[in-house]
């Protein structure tokens, strides 16, 4: 993460749950500086990819959310995501809970279109 911090030119404060290995890197950026938010988002995505690469996962107790949803395919293949969407169909058939906050938008839209066409 320190190397990525240098690469992206943004400072990061690493906060962890010492007992279970959860990381909460706090990337510091200036919202008033053009391009800093986009750089911060790219930096965050690289941290998540690195986590998966070394055997971790995209998220822990805080869920996926809009920040991580389009990176779900970094950790899960198409069949895994389809199985997860099938479970969502069972427990949330109208997809009202956490709408557009769990699955990559492209995959979720295709799944929902197929589901609605079948109704």
Residue ranges of each PLM-predicted region?
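Conserved glycine-rich FAD pyrophosphate-binding loop
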Residues: 1-119
């Amino acid at each position: 993460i320190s190397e990525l911090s240098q690469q992206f030119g943004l400072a990061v404060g690493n906060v962890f749950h010492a007992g279970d290995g959860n990381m909460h890197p706090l990337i510091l950026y200036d919202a008033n500086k053009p391009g800093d938010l986009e750089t911060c988002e790219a930096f965050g995505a690289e941290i998540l990819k690195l986590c998966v690469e070394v055997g971790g996962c995209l998220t822990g107790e805080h869920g996926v959310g809009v920040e991580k949803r389009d990176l779900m395919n970094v950790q899960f293949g198409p069949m895994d995501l389809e199985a997860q969407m099938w479970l969502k169909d069972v427990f949330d058939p109208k997809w009202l809970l956490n709408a557009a906050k769990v699955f990559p938008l492209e995959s979720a839209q295709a799944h929902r279109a197929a589901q609605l066409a079948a109704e």
